Amino acid sequence: GYRKPPFNGSIF
């Protein structure tokens, strides 16, 4: 994941 929720879980 990256950044903070709700962006967690995505890998960029």
From Swiss-Prot:
Keywords: Amidation, Neuropeptide, Secreted. GO terms for biological process: neuropeptide signaling pathway. It is found in: Secreted. The modification Phenylalanine amide is found at F12. One of its GO terms (cellular component) is extracellular region. Belongs to the FARP (FMRFamide related peptide) family. This is FMRFamide-like neuropeptide FLP7.
